[in-house]
């Protein structure tokens, strides 16, 4: 089931896919990073931001609450320039869960000044890939092309954190 379209979302915007393979990682590792407070908090958010996960209830209909916090000086300055808060509460719901295979998360986008609140869906598919694990993330477009571009850059940025987080996880084994 598709979430309601973002207000004013151009029909020409397509969903964005991120296909990542991680050698020497297990699907269970990637699943952990999406589905636990500790895991999600270890990598979510673009570089220069951090999150504090307040609630993660992993079940269909379960809630995810976290604070997205601008932490680096450049990001703080950029947020101020855009008249955006340095910290904003973010909430979402787990829409569909197939353990170690499929995860759908619907965020409520309600923090953009002058834009009506809307839902934004992220779908993640997990699989084994050679000696490692693969995840394909599909992200719906946002309310306009500019925000879709910023969100794409943000996802690209936060995905660069995963190799280090996975290496740290594997060093503890």
Model-derived features with residue positions:
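Short, P/G- and charge-enriched loop/turn segments at secondary-structure junctions
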Residues: 4-7, 76-83, 111-113
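A short, structured loop/turn motif at beta-sheet edges
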Residues: 26-28, 56-61, 95-102, 125-134, ...
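Hydrophobic ligand-binding cavity/cleft-lining segments
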Residues: 1-55
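Short, surface-exposed coil-to-beta transition loops
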Residues: 17, 51, 87-91, 117-122
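Short, highly charged C-terminal tails/helix-capping segments
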Residues: 164-173
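Short beta-edge strand/loop motif at the mouth of beta-sheet-based domains
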Residues: 18, 38-87
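Beta-strand/loop substructures that line and gate deep hydrophobic ligand-binding cavities in soluble
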Residues: 95-96, 104-156
